[in-house]
Amino acid sequence: MNLIESINAAQLRTDIPDFRPGDTVRVHAKVVEGTRERIQMFEGVVIARKNSGINETYTVRKISNGVGVERIFPVHTPRVEQIEVIRHGKVRRAKLYYLRALTGKKARIAERRR
């Protein structure tokens, strides 16, 4: 293992739950406002996971006041306190970008049986 791989391996988090695109998650993100730091929750559907290793990210989409909001979080960042999986969705795609065009009941995802 070379130097870069050993540094990256030391920074990987091990407390990440198993989640896939289509799952509804609640992300507890640390937000710094001036000198204060607080936890902000962002709950939505995972529409994509990209890259691997230390560079891995996931995109979470939610509808807030009728407007679609998406946030991209790095998987291994210390800024994310916790990731809760609320429900597991049954989808047949790795990237759910088509959900951006759907509204209301059409944007629902069936629950996966475990």
Swiss-Prot record:
One Gene Ontology cellular component: cytosolic large ribosomal subunit
PROSITE patterns, per database record: RIBOSOMAL_L19
Claim: Plastid is one of the keywords in the record: no
Keyword annotations of the record: Ribonucleoprotein, Ribosomal protein
GO biological process, one term: translation
Annotated GO MF terms: structural constituent of ribosome
SUPFAM superfamilies per record: Translation proteins SH3-like domain
Record-stated family: Belongs to the bacterial ribosomal protein bL19 family.
Name by which UniProt lists this protein: Large ribosomal subunit protein bL19
Species whose genome carries this gene: Lactococcus lactis subsp. lactis (strain IL1403) (Streptococcus lactis)
Lineage per the UniProt record: Bacteria, Bacillati, Bacillota, Bacilli, Lactobacillales
